[in-house]
Amino acid sequence: MAAAAKPNNLSLVVHGPGDLRLENYPIPEPGPNEVLLRMHSVGICGSDVHYWEYGRIGNFIVKKPMVLGHEASGTVEKVGSSVKHLKPGDRVAIEPGAPRENDEFCKMGRYNLSPSIFFCATPPDDGNLCRFYKHNAAFCYKLPDNVTFEEGALIEPLSVGIHACRRGGVTLGHKVLVCGAGPIGMVTLLVAKAMGAAQVVVTDLSATRLSKAKEIGADLVLQISKESPQEIARKVEGQLGCKPEVTIECTGAEASIQAGIYATRSGGNLVLVGLGSEMTTVPLLHAAIREVDIKGVFRYCNTWPVAISMLASKSVNVKPLVTHRFPLEKALEAFETFKKGLGLKIMLKCDPSDQNP
């Protein structure tokens, strides 16, 4: 009788700008506080594609081969000796950012700001676009039976929306402007509505994406063409009948940030989620004299439990965001599809024995 084939650890590895390869890596052994995961679903993020195209994002530079992927879920294969809350067979969602030390930011509960944090697929740390991956067990969260692996993977972008809405103070009855109808704009829309926003208006250049935003719950949409930032602000006010209390900017485009400042109600909050140029010209005086608070967002913290509750209770529905699925073996084709701007969220299926959502 032939011996069973040894499982491989096919991994998607970026070696430098434009150099993306599928390679077989050793299956890692979990440490005492880690779990080994059989990966199931991993979403492609814009940052993954940026590392592939340019080999860097700001000061994060790919200096050695790095496995991509950080929007992920999988099944526990093996647990470390000190892990008590998980067991083999558990389905989990992975929070990609795990602090390495209990520094001042961790003590404040803002561990996302820790300069030494481990973060999947951020140099020099490997990600989880692979068959098998080990991770800090404290940052692996059990999925309820009614939450799919793909929903578990989408908790990562959903967490950005949760953190952004928290930073903006979105609450019952608010009018909210979301700039950008990409994946992050879409999850921000979903979270704002779930948190009680009375009306959410979404802006974008793409009529197709705005149609999707309308489909998943946007009250109003505004397609941008050649309007000035001031004109965009006036159109938003015209649609809502007032200025929004909260604007969440998800594009990073200079003109969109400018429009966000002009559009936000006096005393309101502008939250910057999208990453653009390091130096940006904005009408700060216009924000200052109207006490528009400008807040930054860097990833997220303390969001996975609430995201799981939102998904399990059906308070949000992220399933319509997935437009393409590829097996891990076709990862290069999947990345080319993303690069062409096709679809919204592309999901890679890492377990050859289970390609279901």
Curated annotation (Swiss-Prot):
Activity modulation: Inhibited by CP-166,572, an inhibitor that is competitive with fructose. Also competitively inhibited by phenanthroline and 4-methylpyrazole in vitro.
Gene Ontology BP terms: D-glucuronate catabolic process to D-xylulose 5-phosphate; flagellated sperm motility; fructose biosynthetic process; glucose metabolic process; sorbitol catabolic process; xylitol catabolic process; xylitol metabolic process
Effect of R110P: In HMNR8; results in protein aggregation
Record keywords: Acetylation, Cell projection, Cilium, Disease variant, Flagellum, Membrane, Metal-binding, Mitochondrion, NAD, Neuropathy, Oxidoreductase, Phosphoprotein, Zinc
GO molecular function terms attached to this record: (R,R)-butanediol dehydrogenase activity; carbohydrate binding; D-sorbitol dehydrogenase (acceptor) activity; D-xylulose reductase activity; identical protein binding; L-iditol 2-dehydrogenase (NAD+) activity; NAD binding; ribitol 2-dehydrogenase (NAD+) activity
Annotated phenotype, changing A153D: In HMNR8; uncertain significance; results in protein aggregation
Induction pattern: Up-regulated by androgens and down-regulated by castration.
CDD domains in UniProt: sorbitol_DH (cd05285)
Membrane topology category: Peripheral membrane protein
Domain of life from the UniProt record: Eukaryota
Subcellular locations according to the entry: Mitochondrion membrane; Cell projection, Cilium, Flagellum
Entry binding sites for NAD(+): I184, D204, R209, V273, G274, L275, V297, F298, R299
InterPro entries (UniProt xref): ADH-like_C, ADH-like_N, ADH_Zn_CS, GroES-like_sf, NAD(P)-bd_dom_sf, PKS_ER, SDH-like
Principal cellular location given in the protein's record: mitochondrion
Keyword Acetylation in record: yes
EC number(s) recorded for this UniProt protein: 1.1.1.-, 1.1.1.4, 1.1.1.14, 1.1.1.56
Sites of Phosphoserine modification: S211, S225
Co-factor note (free text): Binds 1 zinc ion per subunit.
Positions of substrate binding: Y51, E156, R299, Y300
A GO cellular-component term linked to this record: extracellular space
Effect of H135R: In HMNR8; results in protein aggregation
Keyword Mitochondrion applies: yes
Annotated positions of the N-acetylalanine modification: A2
Function noted in UniProt: Polyol dehydrogenase that catalyzes the reversible NAD(+)-dependent oxidation of various sugar alcohols. Is mostly active with D-sorbitol (D-glucitol), L-threitol, xylitol and ribitol as substrates, leading to the C2-oxidized products D-fructose, L-erythrulose, D-xylulose, and D-ribulose, respectively. Is a key enzyme in the polyol pathway that interconverts glucose and fructose via sorbitol, which constitutes an important alternate route for glucose metabolism.
Assembly notes: Homotetramer.
Name of protein: Sorbitol dehydrogenase
Species of the source: Homo sapiens (Human)
Source organism phylogeny: Eukaryota, Metazoa, Chordata, Craniata, Vertebrata
Gene that encodes the chain: SORD
